[in-house]
Amino acid sequence: SAIACSVDSMKYMCKRFSVMIISYDKMNQLRHVRFLKNKEGVLAHMAKHRRRLVPCFDAVKTAFNEELTPCGDIAHWTNPKGGYFISLYVMPGCAKRVAQLCKDCGLTLTGAGSAYPYHKDPDDAHLRIAPTYPSLDEVETASDLLCVCVRLAAVEKLLAEKA
């Protein structure tokens, strides 16, 4: 940036700039404060989020329980009590393959190993599932597809080990 101004204006601007810091968007913070008002406002707003998100999380967990649990030890997952993610652990060496199978079908997941530093999951087993943005119908369809991809990747791995 550059400023073209008089000496007096430059002194004024230097004084103003001396107290500025690089930080978050103050106007956006002000909008949040005005909208949420206080702790009760934050809690009420978060309750609205919860009402919308719980059915989506339940849909994912239902699909996992119905479609993956009967398959034995091919996957396990977390049961979060809050937050925005479910951690899905597939067979070691399969997370990237599951993500690719999903992508090939048109389903974009958070990258395999994304919860690890530099996205380097040493076991290639972790997928972070975020059912927070899509509609409930989309989450249900995506969960079913994800389960198919987990099962297919597991079968591919088991067959490769037998060969």
What residue ranges belong to the model's regions?
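PLP-dependent class I/II
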Residues: 1-163
